[in-house]
Amino acid sequence: MSIFLNKGFSMPTRETLGGKLSCFIGRHLALRNKNTFIDKSALISPKALINPRCGEIKIGKKCLICHGAIVQGNVTMGENCSVQPYSIIVGYGSPTDKLGEIRIGSNVRIASHVMLVGANHIFKDRDKPICTQSVERKSIVIEDDVWIAGRVNIMCGVTIGKGSVIAAGAVVTKDVPPYSVVGGVPAKIIKER
């Protein structure tokens, strides 16, 4: 399977990734990692980072990942989705352990500077540094036909219902019912569509 890349595409080096590279660059991107599945109609723009780490990445038909976007870990994306510049989508777990994964349905629009991370740091023990207390993993689910506006943060464990709109700058800490418009910090339902 090969995917055409825009002129100017660059990949991190082994040193900047801190481990094995999952792809090799030539005229086309040749995916070598058995845990990365990108449909041939998907477009991966220059300077996007796609890295399954220990997980599995699946990107469906006609998806667009723009420059500066990061998709890593356990992430599944349906068809006809877009991830705009500088958005970060980080799933946790492995191909067999889905706790902490990010599941994105079809026809989802993710604007610039959106953050979805399937884990959060534990910081209950004051006698231990936070960085030694591990993370709590919870999956994030974005159902079909959702629009996530710019600079939104969706916390781990949240499900965004079908047809919902998340207003710019929102911090989503709770599940969003289908066909809802939410906004604010923390996000609250503004109206139904």
Name each model feature, range by range.
Residues 165-171:
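A generic "structured core" feature
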Residues 77, 160, 171:
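Short alpha-helical
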Residues 48-59, 65-156, 185, 193:
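Flexible, glycine/small-residue-enriched loop-and-beta-strand segment within the central core
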Residues 1-35, 40-41, 107-109, 113-114, ...:
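Terminal amphipathic alpha-helical/low-complexity segments used for targeting or macromolecular assembly
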Residues 62, 169, 187:
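ATP/adenylate-binding site constellation spanning eukaryotic-like Ser/Thr protein kinases
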Residues 25-34, 46, 67, 85:
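An amphipathic, basic-hydrophobic alpha-helix
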